Curated annotation (Swiss-Prot):
<dbReference type="GO" id="GO:0046933">
    <property type="term" value="F:proton-transporting ATP synthase activity, rotational mechanism"/>
</dbReference>
<feature type="transmembrane region" description="Helical">
    <location>
        <begin position="103"/>
        <end position="123"/>
    </location>
</feature>
<keyword id="KW-0813">Transport</keyword>
<dbReference type="GO" id="GO:0045259">
    <property type="term" value="C:proton-transporting ATP synthase complex"/>
</dbReference>
<dbReference type="GO" id="GO:0042777">
    <property type="term" value="P:proton motive force-driven plasma membrane ATP synthesis"/>
</dbReference>
<keyword id="KW-0375">Hydrogen ion transport</keyword>
<comment type="subunit">
    <text>F-type ATPases have 2 components, CF(1) - the catalytic core - and CF(0) - the membrane proton channel. CF(1) has five subunits: alpha(3), beta(3), gamma(1), delta(1), epsilon(1). CF(0) has three main subunits: a(1), b(2) and c(9-12). The alpha and beta chains form an alternating ring which encloses part of the gamma chain. CF(1) is attached to CF(0) by a central stalk formed by the gamma and epsilon chains, while a peripheral stalk is formed by the delta and b chains.</text>
</comment>
<keyword id="KW-0138">CF(0)</keyword>
<dbReference type="InterPro" id="IPR000568">
    <property type="entry name" value="ATP_synth_F0_asu"/>
</dbReference>
<comment type="similarity">
    <text>Belongs to the ATPase A chain family.</text>
</comment>
<dbReference type="GO" id="GO:0005886">
    <property type="term" value="C:plasma membrane"/>
</dbReference>
<keyword id="KW-1003">Cell membrane</keyword>
<feature type="transmembrane region" description="Helical">
    <location>
        <begin position="149"/>
        <end position="169"/>
    </location>
</feature>
<feature type="transmembrane region" description="Helical">
    <location>
        <begin position="245"/>
        <end position="265"/>
    </location>
</feature>
<keyword id="KW-0066">ATP synthesis</keyword>
<keyword id="KW-0812">Transmembrane</keyword>
<keyword id="KW-0472">Membrane</keyword>
Length: 274
């Protein structure tokens, strides 16, 4: 465990691996994960932020390098893989997005690959990076799966929500957007309060469900790996962890795909002219 506590029971082990490396922005000091003080608005999960930024930069570097060295001849394995991903995302956008914006395909590609990379961190041995963080860098806690942190998934969903508002106002105008919120589904002024409540809930539910769906699935997957490592004897862990890891590959890919698809669909709905 960390220098500030020792693992004595499976409960301690599980709790340790569910603690984020947190920074108190008021004092710029690391938060002791074993202190009883609750997290506040000024508490930053710097491990989630660090890994999400690093993986995002890795995505940009690799795809930029492949694009710069692309050849019309026989492509290498990396170029082939990148072209397959780009083709898959491009076809998905063509099928689901009916607007005119040219940034949706690059956005969808970024969302899919970035979320997939963050999800794939769940396939690393559960103790590997936390052990390195503790014994090499002296970190009191470390979580390595950014999408198992609700603040990360809701932040990404918030970005999608801002784009929904942007394209809605861009395509319909401020008046059209307000009319959409106040005159649907009942097209009569007397029902404006009811329409506003119904449409407001429908609009706000999109980013909330988008972020919580990804968080819930990845948190559950991470927790299962922790339970396997914390409750079972070492000689039986591989018997469950290996099959679950193989099945989890499908889950992490599917969750990245769902996040991308819902982003495209929501932006397509926002781009419709009425």
């Amino acid at each position: 465990m960390s220098a500030s506590g020792e693992i004595s029971t499976p409960r301690d082990y599980i709790g340790h691996h569910l603690n984020n490396l947190q920074l108190d922005l008021r004092t710029f000091e690391l938060v002791n994960p074993h202190s009883p003080g609750p997290a506040t608005f000024w508490t930053l999960n710097i491990d989630s932020l660090f890994f999400s930024v690093v993986l995002g930069l890795a995505f940009l570097f690799v795809f930029r390098k492949v694009a710069a060295g692309a050849t019309s001849g026989v492509p290498g394995k990396l170029q082939t893989a990148v072209e397959l991903i780009i083709g898959f995302v491009d076809n998905s956008v063509r099928d689901m997005y009916h607007g005119k914006s040219k940034v949706i395909a690059p956005l969808a590609l970024t969302v899919f690959v970035w979320v997939l990379l963050m999800n794939m961190m769940d396939l690393l041995p559960i103790d590997l990076l936390p052990y390195i963080g503790e014994h090499v860098f002296g970190l009191p806690a470390l979580r390595v799966v950014p999408t198992a942190d609700v603040s990360i998934t809701l932040s990404m969903a918030l970005g999608v929500f801002i784009l929904i508002l942007f394209y809605s106002i861009k395509m319909k105008g401020v008046g059209g957007f307000v009319k959409e919120l106040t005159m649907q589904p009942f097209n009569h002024p007397i029902f404006i309060p009811v329409n506003l409540i119904l449409e407001g809930v429908s609009l706000l539910s999109k980013p909330v469900s988008l972020g919580l769906r990804l968080f819930g699935n990845m948190y559950a997957g991470e927790l299962i790996f922790i339970l396997i490592a914390g409750l079972l004897p070492w000689w039986s862990q591989w018997m469950l962890s290996l099959p679950w890891a193989i099945f989890h590959i499908l889950i992490i890919t599917l969750q990245a795909f769902i996040f991308m698809v819902l982003t495209i669909v929501y932006l397509s709905m926002a781009s419709e002219e009425h």
